[in-house]
Curated annotation (Swiss-Prot):
Chain spans, region ACP-binding: 245-249
Enzyme class, UniProt record, top EC level: transferase
The gene coding this protein: fabH
UniProt-recorded name of the protein: Beta-ketoacyl-[acyl-carrier-protein] synthase III
Reactions listed under catalytic activity: malonyl-[ACP] + acetyl-CoA + H(+) = 3-oxobutanoyl-[ACP] + CO2 + CoA
Length: 317
């Protein structure tokens, strides 16, 4: 038994900040950002808009897209690294917003790989036959973790949320297989310099960009090749490749190494920037909204995040 995606939704804050606007308070320029990242703008939540609010707005759209009622949901998983509070979880707050009671809800923290991790966890719980309809969300307010004086990180991230509704599949559609990995010895490649038990703050993002670039390509390629081989798929079988939207150079290099045709690669990083766990469901929702996905299409997700955490998933639509 496997799960399938029956609905998608997304939400991006209304405030858009272009590269040119960033030059007003950080030493950078549009060409420098575009050539290194592919990013031209990012959405930024205001001070009164929290991760739970982003999650709610995307969830409502996914529920509508799936043609279900919120009352049909029997499990909520939110993948986030920017919760409203240390506790309770964003998922329980969202559950309250939706007026749901007596169902489990929890946050999952695997940073940019969170959605792939969440998909595997949700699928396992659906396969247990205990849960029928799962709301899985990637939601992030990454700009709350930025040092706006650090041009190596502040230009990279944005805010947003993407949601999917998952149900048990009764045919060959749905999650074919996924894999997830982590390597704790590499945690200092990307981390925040704060933490509740360490110094009582959330901290700001610290990143070793060149090391992360190398690890991202190596580990995502390995994950994808293992997944394809295990399921007797070739790259030519993939209809759409939806990678984590961290950096267009990573996406392009990975596609080159795997020989994935350009028209199959979904890129939203230009307009969304890096929305961490929200990036894949945002890209998926964007693609679905264009009406391009057909029944039977094979979708490949792949992501890497801090930890390091990484993984991939194959979906038959």
């Amino acid at each position: 038994m496997t799960c399938k995606i029956i609905g998608c939704g997304q939400y991006l804050p209304s405030k858009i900040v272009s590269n040119d606007e960033l030059t007003k308070f950080v030493d950078t320029n549009d060409e420098w950002i575009r050539t290194r990242t592919g990013i031209t703008q990012r959405h930024i939540a205001d001070d009164t808009e929290y991760t739970s609010h982003l999650a709610l707005k995307s969830a409502e759209k996914a529920i509508e897209d799936a043609g279900i009622s919120a009352n049909d949901i029997d499990l909520i998983i939110i993948c986030t690294t920017t919760p409203d509070h240390s506790f309770p979880s964003v998922a329980t707050k969202l559950q309250g917003y939706l007026g749901l009671t007596n169902i489990p809800s929890f946050d999952l923290q695997a940073v940019c790989a969170g959605f792939v991790y969440g998909l595997q966890v949700a699928n396992s719980l659906i396969a247990s036959s205990k849960y029928k309809t799962v709301l899985l969300i990637g939601a992030e307010k990454m700009t709350s973790l930025l040092d706006w004086n650090d041009r190596s990180t502040c230009v990279l991230f944005g805010d947003g949320a993407g949601s999917v509704i998952l149900q048990r599949s009764s045919d060959d559609s749905g999650l074919i297989e996924s894999n997830i990995f982590s390597s704790g010895i590499d945690y200092d490649i990307l981390y925040t310099n704060g933490g509740i038990s360490m110094n009582g703050t959330s901290g700001k993002i610290i990143m070793q960009g060149q090391k992360l670039f190398r690890h991202a390509i190596e580990k995502m390629q390995q994950s994808i090749e293992e997944l394809l081989c295990a399921n007797q798929f070739s790259v030519s079988d993939i209809d759409y490749f939806i990678p984590h939207q961290a950096n267009v150079r990573i996406i392009n290099k990975l596609a080159e190494l795997l020989n994935i045709e350009e028209h199959k690669i979904i890129k939203t990083v230009e307009k969304h920037a890096n929305c961490s766990a929200a990036s894949i469901p945002l890209a998926l929702s964007t693609l679905k909204g264009l009406g391009k996905i057909k029944k039977g299409d094979i979708l490949l997700f792949s992501a890497i995040g801090a930890g390091l955490t990484w993984g991939s998933a194959l979906i038959r639509w």
